Regions:
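Short amphipathic alpha-helical segment that frequently serves as the phosphate-/nucleotide-binding helix
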Residues: 48-52, 91, 173
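Glycine-rich phosphate-binding loop and adjoining beta1-alpha1-beta2 segment
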Residues: 73-110
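Metal-dependent de-N-acetylase/amidase catalytic core
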Residues: 1-38, 61, 85-86, 99, ...
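Divalent metal-coordination and catalytic microenvironments
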Residues: 45, 71, 94, 108, ...
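ATP-dependent adenylation/pyrophosphate-handling site
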Residues: 26, 32-85
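Hydrophobic alpha-helical membrane-insertion segments
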Residues: 52-54, 80, 111, 121, ...
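A structural preference for short, hydrophobic beta-strand core positions in alpha/beta folds
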Residues: 67, 110-111
């Protein structure tokens, strides 16, 4: 049986160090029963590898969790025999994985973009015959992300760091961030009611480190780590899964997040830099 003191959350805000035993206790923007988390996963296993503890922590605080898996898993085969069936296999493994962490099956969503081909789906365009992930006669990552953001209406979004080597991770990061503003604006009304405000966004690490240090540390009981490892083990088709589990175990029952800040351009911010100043004389 876990105790409250088995959980530790530390958030760094400037020179302030906030410590608590819940996510809510270290958050300035917590929206009580309106909280809703959306994890955007370039590939089916990215969220469990980078945020398998956080998914469980959300459940602990009664926050609904939705997982949007961007690609179809078609490039994940490790044998010739699997080439034609790997998407189906990965889909079954994915449901097993995230349902084991308490995510309802209906909250596990597949966008359906072809694995390793996301560069061809940047932006939004009128769908043509062989396009994938068609919504309202349009295709493209920004079309899909805007649609799902408006349908799910999350208060917070989580996505792998932009510093990852995998092009799919980088593309998803970039396309999601601009889609947050699309989803909060009035364009493309056929994709749903605009969001009242832009959700807060956090990066989590999967394979590569953060570009800038994280600001939130989450520490859980060992049982949460064992649940995470068991969920990762659902991806039996992936031959390298044992090495990934070793890495996760060595990291212990801890995960970290980096908050993404949108620093919008404001000319007045630079005005003082260019103002004429009195000459300054220095004495030795």
């Amino acid at each position: 049986m876990t105790k409250v003191n088995d959980f530790e959350f530390v958030r760094l805000v400037g020179t302030e160090r906030r410590v608590g035993t819940t996510l809510e206790s270290v958050s300035k923007h917590w929206q009580k029963d309106k909280e809703c988390f959306l994890f955007v996963s370039p590939h089916d296993d990215d969220v469990v590898l980078g945020s398998g503890l956080l998914v469980q922590l959300a459940k602990r605080e009664n926050v609904p969790v939705h997982i949007l898996i961007v690609t179809d898993g078609s490039m994940g085969y490790c044998s010739f025999e699997e080439m034609a069936t790997i998407s189906y296999i990965r889909r079954k493994e994915t449901f097993e994985c995230y349902q084991a962490l308490g995510v309802p099956k209906e909250n596990i969503i597949w966008a359906g973009f072809p694995d390793c081909q996301l560069s061809g789906y940047r932006g939004r365009r009128k769908a043509i015959n062989d396009d994938k992930a068609v919504i309202q006669n349009f295709s493209g990552l920004q079309n899909a992300f805007t649609y799902y953001l408006r349908q799910i209406r999350p208060t917070q979004c989580f996505v792998p760091t932009s510093n990852d080597l995998h092009p799919d991770h980088r593309i998803v990061y970039e396309e999601l961030l601009i889609s947050l503003f699309h989803a909060s604006g009035d364009i493309w009304p056929e994709l749903g009611e605009p969001l009242a405000k832009v959700p807060y966004v956090h990066e989590f690490g999967v394979y590569c480190d953060f570009l800038q240090p994280p600001q939130l540390k989450m520490k859980t009981p060992e049982s949460y780590l064992e649940n995470k490892v068991a969920a990762i083990s659902a991806f039996r088709s992936q031959k390298q899964i044992s090495s990934l589990i070793d890495i996760v175990r060595k990291g212990g029952p801890e995960e970290y997040l980096h908050a993404v800040e949108f620093r919008l351009y404001q000319p007045q911010r630079y005005r003082a830099v260019f103002e004429e100043k009195d000459d300054m004389f220095f004495t030795r």
